[in-house]
Amino acid sequence: INHFGEKLRWCMDLLAVDYEESNVGGITSIILRGRTVPWLVDRLSCSLIGNSDEALWYLFAVHVPTMQGDAAQQGAALLRRSEETMAWEERLNALGHAIQGWAYFYLLATNADPDLSLRYWGGKEPTVPLLHRLAQRCGYPAFKGLMRKAFALDDESLHQKRYDTFVAVLDDADAALELKGGNHLTGESISYVDISFCALLGPLLPSTIIPLWANGRFSSFAPLQDHPSMPTELVDFEDALQRRPCGQYIEKMFREWRNRPFAS
């Protein structure tokens, strides 16, 4: 599961972009590429973009002008930037890192079930290359140690700071939805901010979002819906998030907009 990959993939699906997806193991990509964020490769223009935000602006410049009718208007509205959306960009980028560190505190705890992390990393996903899956399974103890060190998971104060960071963003999202009448975070139409927010928080709602993640492409994620080893803290957080307006908004967005493109 890659938050930023889902953001880009979801936007491309809404825009009906004709693309081919190549999946890599979540942790092995650090070794192969030096990073885990998605790449957008346009062979026609020989372009390679390694940042999900910049990939969206590329699509805005190259793909949206080729769209027709209502879909073109929706596509332009989806990717249009404003002072408000750019302010959200900064908050959501911080949110992504905070969520990762906070969740890994439990998923990579000393007594954590390796099956959870391996599924989140794609270690049991048939669409991920076999060698990547084998590397993740065989190298799990080493990867776990490296991730614990990289995210400073022994630092209790940092763990609390991460939690406070993303709860503050959730409060902002609840307030924005109330201000906008419950439609979307930044206005009447869907924005890339809405997609980013939902993609970042979706993995923390596994009981409802996992079947809809990536439009249901990854069969190995299914056991995460009701995994017997899911940490209690993550289960409790999901329950609390589902009671929030922003949590209900995330579920609504996945149900209504994850499996269809804009209508032309």
Predicted regions: what they are:
Residues 3-10, 50-53, 57, 83, ...:
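A structural signal for well-ordered alpha-helical segments within the folded catalytic domains
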